[in-house]
């Protein structure tokens, strides 16, 4: 079984954790941006089927 020879330093742990958090942050920003563009109808890359409300009235 593979076992690390030495302990990982606190600074290296912090750097890796911050990189991991930053990836999650940017994924959330992109998702929010896409949701905003879909809700306003300005999205050019995401198609949403429009349903008519005439059947409900």
Swiss-Prot record:
Belongs to the bacterial ribosomal protein bL32 family. GO terms for biological process: translation. GO terms for molecular function: structural constituent of ribosome. This is Large ribosomal subunit protein bL32c. It holds the Pfam family Ribosomal_L32p. The lineage of its organism: Eukaryota, Viridiplantae, Streptophyta, Embryophyta, Tracheophyta. It is found in: Plastid, Chloroplast. The keyword Plastid applies. Keywords: Chloroplast, Plastid, Ribonucleoprotein, Ribosomal protein. One of its GO terms (cellular component) is chloroplast. The gene is rpl32.
């Amino acid at each position: 079984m593979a076992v690390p020879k030495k302990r990982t330093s606190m600074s290296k742990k912090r750097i890796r954790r911050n990189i991991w958090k930053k990836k999650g942050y940017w994924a959330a920003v992109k998702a929010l941006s896409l949701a905003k563009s879909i809700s306003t109808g300005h999205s050019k890359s995401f198609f949403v089927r429009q349903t008519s409300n005439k059947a409900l009235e």
